[in-house]
């Protein structure tokens, strides 16, 4: 009988400290960290004094805003959301610690365990090992505690010049770029002939030039819709699987000619046709003239468009078409119902060319989605890079201050595209430069908190 009781106690002790997260505190052999909360921490920041000297000041960080995740399966404790830059992780305090047993921390010097006092400031500049000792004096469990802090400012942007003096871009003009999966496409004109240059996002310094047929293709009209490219040639709709060889689309209904392709969504292909905005939901085979809410002008002189996910519902997308009519800025928006239940027309948003944050007057506009906002660029009259503009109100207000732009000179044509890793590529003809940059926080990875 005594032997059976001894075996049962050992089994209970082992159950209390196994690696399954569903373990409950049912025996004296239980040894789990149930909760752990960071306390008030110090954050040291730099500033310049009036005399120009660098000085440091300290602010408080509420540690509880950065919850600690407990991975019972792999015996790890960490904060998914890193502490802000400058937080002093050498002096970490805890405002709460709940465990089924005594908690000790391994010394960085001797390697021995000492009782952890949550009121003490502890050095977590490197991951530390804590051990929970059960009340039976036998069972224990170790955890690696990793207090993470950002090493870079979230809203800062770092640019890298990945290429310079590329001969393939020496004489290309009217650049227009797209990214498809991991391939960069830069369409343009070389003399009067359309070309496309391609590179992999992993090696944006290596580009391959391809001549395009037919020779009348409008390089600036190219859009990606579904798994194909669409563009215009002599105002007629063309399609391609590789961006190099193009064939006419056999349209059975719609306009006789197109002015420009201005957007592509999950289902909708959008175009300007004279004084109309038209759309197709069958890959350009048939077209419908869309309703306009006013007689305001369309952007027939300089234009760009974009379709992106709606913030209202996953069943909707938002379409934006903007540009210039003469020297006047123009903005139109439309909601697209992916279910096909409702059909909405285009709404004109009057713009004031003299208002702060107005649409910049540029040529060869490029429009992309970035950081849940609209990213706009274009060329100045001489073809040089026109800068980066960001709009968080769907094209009504444009500001440059959010995006740091590299110093670019010598460009005779420039365009922008964005890849799936949130990198912005600035591609410059003439100088043959390619720049790549990203807002730091858009490169941060979110760790899974569902453990198996």
Indicate where each model-derived feature is located.
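Conserved Ser/Thr-centered positions that define the repeating blades of beta-propeller domains
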Residues: 197-202, 239-241, 280-281, 333-340, ...
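Predominantly extracytoplasmic/ectodomain segments of secreted and cell-surface proteins
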Residues: 18-173
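Entry beta-strands of beta-propeller and related beta-repeat scaffolds
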Residues: 181-187, 227-231, 266-271, 314-322, ...
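Repeated scaffold domains used in trafficking and secretory/extracellular systems
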Residues: 167-178, 212-227, 251-267, 293-315, ...
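C-terminal motif of bacterial Sec signal peptides marking the signal peptidase cleavage site
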Residues: 12-16
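Beta-strand-rich domains and repeat architectures in extracellular enzymes and scaffolds
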Residues: 163-191
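Beta-propeller fold detector
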Residues: 155-165, 204-214, 247-254, 287-296, ...
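Blade-level signature of beta-propeller repeat domains, shared across WD40, Kelch, NHL, RCC1
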Residues: 409-452
């Amino acid at each position: 009988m005594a032997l059976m009781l001894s075996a049962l106690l050992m089994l209970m002790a082992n159950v209390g400290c196994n690696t399954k997260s569903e373990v409950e505190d049912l025996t004296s052999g239980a040894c789990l960290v149930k909760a752990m909360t960071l306390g008030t921490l110090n954050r040291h920041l730099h500033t310049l004094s009036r005399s120009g000297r660098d000085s440091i000041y300290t602010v408080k960080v509420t540690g509880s805003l950065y919850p600690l995740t407990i991975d019972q399966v792999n015996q790890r404790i960490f904060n998914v959301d890193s502490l802000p830059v400058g937080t002093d992780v050498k002096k970490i305090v805890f405002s709460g610690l709940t465990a089924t047993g005594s908690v000790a921390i391994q010394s960085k010097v001797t390697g021995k365990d000492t009782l952890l006092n949550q009121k003490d400031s502890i050095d977590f500049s490197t991951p530390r090992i804590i051990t929970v000792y059960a009340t039976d004096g036998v069972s224990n469990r170790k955890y690696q505690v990793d207090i993470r802090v950002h090493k870079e400012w979230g809203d800062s942007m770092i640019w890298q010049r990945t290429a310079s003096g590329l001969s393939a871009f020496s004489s290309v003009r009217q650049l227009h770029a797209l990214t498809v999966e991991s391939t960069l496409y830069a369409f343009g004109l070389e003399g009067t002939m359309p070309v496309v240059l391609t590179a992999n996002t992993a090696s944006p310094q290596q580009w391959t030039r391809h001549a395009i047929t037919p020779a009348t293709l409008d390089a600036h009209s190219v859009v990606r819709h579904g798994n194909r490219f669409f563009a215009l040639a002599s105002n007629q709709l063309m399609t391609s699987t590789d961006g190099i060889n193009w064939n006419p689309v056999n349209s059975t209904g719609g306009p006789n000619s197109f002015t420009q392709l201005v957007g592509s969504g999950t289902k909708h292909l959008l175009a300007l046709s004279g004084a109309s905005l038209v759309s197709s939901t069958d890959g350009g085979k048939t077209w419908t003239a869309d309703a306009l809410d006013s007689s305001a002008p369309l952007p027939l002189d300089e234009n760009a468009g974009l379709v992106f996910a709606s913030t209202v519902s996953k069943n909707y997308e938002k379409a934006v078409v903007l540009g210039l009519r003469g020297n006047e800025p123009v903005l139109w928006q439309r909601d697209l119902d992916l279910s096909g239940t409702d059909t909405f027309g285009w709404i004109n948003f009057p713009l004031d060319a003299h208002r702060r944050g107005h649409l910049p007057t540029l040529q060869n506009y490029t429009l992309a989605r970035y950081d849940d906002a609209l990213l706009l660029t274009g060329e100045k009259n001489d073809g040089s890079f026109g800068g980066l503009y960001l709009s968080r109100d769907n094209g009504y207000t444009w500001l440059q201050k959010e995006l740091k732009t590299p110093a670019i000179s010598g460009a005779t044509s420039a365009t922008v595209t964005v890849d799936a890793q949130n990198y912005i590529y600035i591609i410059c003809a003439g100088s043959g430069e390619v720049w790549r940059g990203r807002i730091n926080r858009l490169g941060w990875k979110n760790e899974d908190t569902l453990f198996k």
